[in-house]
């Protein structure tokens, strides 16, 4: 956060300001992870049906790994992948790493920009589950399937996955 401040601010980064920014960052990092209602039960259902679940998220690896650990949801996932950017190349890389068959692999997410559209571009099927708290930077038009047989589902709630998978 201090580096970002230095890049974006005209104000000089003093020792006092650096200390305040670090204290703020520690409060953010320690904030409890808020789980959307029904997510643990839905993940349990999917894992119980022998679906191979891989969590792919973007951001700082240490921060994202900590969030996953603190969420209590890590046990539902066969793997957790933290990438710098969720784009078609990243989805291809993860699919290759885990030898995923794109004809039967689904991406589930709330962001057209970072989840649905790049997954479709990478040849995966996609499920779009909109959420009110999705960052505005993640908004864009939903793409369309790119190949024959590819599917895009839109569900109202994460828990609706249990009716489809």
Predicted region positions:
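Short, conserved alpha-helical segments within structured domains
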Residues: 17-21, 38, 86-87
